Each structure stands twice: as C-alpha cells, then as structure tokens.
Amino acid sequence: MPPKARSGARRTGRRVVKKNVAQGHAYIKSTFNNTIVSITDPNGAVISWASSGHVGFKGSRKSTPFAAQMAAENAARKAMDHGMKKVDVFVKGPGSGRETAIRSLQAAGLEVSSISDVTPQPHNGCRPPKRRRV
C-alpha cells in the first residue's frame, strides 16, 4: 500500500509560464448553448481561454451576448498579460454572442487585424434537429 500523504503537504501545481507573444489568433466558438473564446499564438498553442460557463454563468444564461462579452474580456485580459497586442479573429457557429465577443476583444485593448467566419457548412450531411414547437 502506498504511503498516505501528510495533511498539510503542499500541492505542486503546474506553474504558468509567461510567454511574450505580440500577435496571435482569437477563436470564438459561439453555439446555441455556450460561447468559448480561445486565444493562441501564431503556431496554434493556446495562451488563454474562457467560456461563458467558466466565467460563472449557468444554464440558459450561458448563451446570452453578455456572457460572451464577459468570456471574451476574461480571455483577452489573460492574453494581454502574456504580451498579446494584435489578434486575427476566427468566428465559428450560429450563436448570439459572436459580434459581442469581437467587440469586447477590441474594448479590452487588443487590436483586431482581421475577422473571418470559419463556420463549417454541411454538404447535406447530418439531419438537423426538429423544429421547436413552443
């Protein structure tokens, strides 16, 4: 049986390494239920990320534009701590937080150099969900 850890023993977590990256990519995935913002360096290594749920919203409030705004601000703040100044934005998905997230990235102090929509388009792939009857 392995020895039991002492109560009061320190836990060694992963230390955050400060990278100095001036330019990168911001990926905004906005679904009907949530918005996820990931900011990466030009090679694709994630520097910071945030989502509506991670920021503290639960349930149907995660899909609101305000929740997307808070998530984008949070991710931008963390990226700017690593020296990020300029981003290319890639937006994916049909959600309501798309434009709000882009605006809040700009408001947080990141310079948005380009915006492109990378929403995947099916060539008649999966059957879509049935119509809602309210």
UniProtKB/Swiss-Prot annotation:
SUPFAM superfamilies to which the protein is assigned, alphabetical: Translational machinery components
Alphabetical UniProt keywords: Ribonucleoprotein, Ribosomal protein, RNA-binding, rRNA-binding
Function: Located on the platform of the 30S subunit, it bridges several disparate RNA helices of the 16S rRNA. Forms part of the Shine-Dalgarno cleft in the 70S ribosome.
Protein name (record): Small ribosomal subunit protein uS11
Quaternary organization: Part of the 30S ribosomal subunit. Interacts with proteins S7 and S18. Binds to IF-3.
A GO biological-process term: translation
Domain of life of the source: Bacteria
Coiled coil segments of this chain: none
Pfam families tied to this protein: Ribosomal_S11
Gene Ontology terms, MF aspect: rRNA binding; structural constituent of ribosome
Disulfide bridges in this chain: none
InterPro entries, per the entry: Ribosomal_uS11 (IPR001971), Ribosomal_uS11_bac-type (IPR019981), Ribosomal_uS11_CS (IPR018102), Ribosomal_uS11_sf (IPR036967)
Chain segments carrying region Disordered: 114-134
Family statement drawn from the similarity comment of this UniProt entry: Belongs to the universal ribosomal protein uS11 family.
Cellular component, GO, one term: ribonucleoprotein complex
Cited PROSITE patterns: RIBOSOMAL_S11
